[in-house]
């Protein structure tokens, strides 16, 4: 099974992540940021990953460091757990609607980190969660996993719905791209490496 455990401690945050890519969607998320916990839970549930995230951060300052650093550690965990990437499907695009919102996530587990982000969010906060940190999370995740990630709003206005659809879509897209396909012999690249 493809699993990883990653710890990271800085002067701003202390984060622990356990990941099983081949899980059933169980989760235990505790970041101190209620809305972010909800998003990571949805990500795990819909991606069918078993995920544990325990994070302590300088929330008295703001949520930025915690959200970004969870992205760093989670991306690192996916990189470790995905191993040599032999026989993975590699690419995926997934659309997720939530009421009026429709979000598309496309990704390539390529070893080439990149983020294209186009989620215009009207509200500055959802609960104590600062919405500008959504982009920081996706960037940290993509760059530490080493994937090309596109996250786009096709339509929608409700900030909660847009963010929720994006986390669900990321989970679904990763589930598909990380699936093993017996027809793929070795690394899914003509270069021979990812």
Swiss-Prot record:
Biological processes per GO annotation: L-histidine biosynthetic process
Subcellular location(s) per record: Cytoplasm
Gene: hisB
Highest taxon of the lineage: Bacteria
GO cellular component terms, A-Z: cytoplasm
Molecular function in Gene Ontology: imidazoleglycerol-phosphate dehydratase activity
EC number(s) stated in the UniProt entry for this protein: 4.2.1.19
InterPro entries: IGPD_sf, ImidazoleglycerolP_deHydtase, ImidazoleglycerP_deHydtase_CS, Ribosomal_Su5_D2-typ_SF
UniProt-recorded name of the protein: Imidazoleglycerol-phosphate dehydratase
The species this protein was found in: Caldanaerobacter subterraneus subsp. tengcongensis (strain DSM 15242 / JCM 11007 / NBRC 100824 / MB4) (Thermoanaerobacter tengcongensis)
Keywords per UniProt: Amino-acid biosynthesis, Cytoplasm, Histidine biosynthesis, Lyase
């Amino acid at each position: 099974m493809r699993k990883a455990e990653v710890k990271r401690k800085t002067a701003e945050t202390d984060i622990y992540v356990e990941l099983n890519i081949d899980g059933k969607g169980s989760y235990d998320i505790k970041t101190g940021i209620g809305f972010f916990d909800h998003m990571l839970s949805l990500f795990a549930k819909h991606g069918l990953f078993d995920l544990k995230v325990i994070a302590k951060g300088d929330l008295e300052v703001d949520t930025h460091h915690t959200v970004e650093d969870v992205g760093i550690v989670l991306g690192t965990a996916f990189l470790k757990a995905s191993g040599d990437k032999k026989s993975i499907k590699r690419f995926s695009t997934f659309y997720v609607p939530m009421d009026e919102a429709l979000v598309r996530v496309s990704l390539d587990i390529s070893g080439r980190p990149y983020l294209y982000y186009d989620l215009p969010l009207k509200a500055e906060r959802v609960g104590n969660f600062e919405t500008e940190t959504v982009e920081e999370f996706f960037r940290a995740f993509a760059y530490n996993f080493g994937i090309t990630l596109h996250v786009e709003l096709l339509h929608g206005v409700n900030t909660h719905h847009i963010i929720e659809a994006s986390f669900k879509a990321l989970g679904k897209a990763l589930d598909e791209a990380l699936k093993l396909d017996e027809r793929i012999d070795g690394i899914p690249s003509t270069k021979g490496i990812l």
